[in-house]
Amino acid sequence: MGKTITIADDVYYELVKMKGKKSFSELLRELIGKKKKGNLDVLMIAFGTRTPEEVEELKKELKEVEEWMDSWTPASL
């Protein structure tokens, strides 16, 4: 069953840009999954369960995400 949520216009426009041909549900599932995976990665690093190669790959991915987020500009209303 579908649910209705209310979000700010600027958030809506950013989600529209991000989703491409996906549904909003697909996009939100993907973002939630990344957040959960991100939390697991933090725990794995904290407890030293990553190989040096995995740590380097994570650093690369984090840099890419940081650059991607820096490229965002607030939507004009």
From Swiss-Prot:
Entry similarity comment: Belongs to the UPF0330 family.
UniProt source species: Thermococcus kodakarensis (strain ATCC BAA-918 / JCM 12380 / KOD1) (Pyrococcus kodakaraensis (strain KOD1))
Function: Possibly the antitoxin component of a type II toxin-antitoxin (TA) system.
Superkingdom: Archaea
Record Pfam families: VAPB_antitox (PF02697)
Assigned keywords, A-Z: Toxin-antitoxin system
Descriptive protein name: Putative antitoxin TK1752
InterPro entries hit by this protein: Put_antitoxin (IPR003847)
Disulfide bonds: none
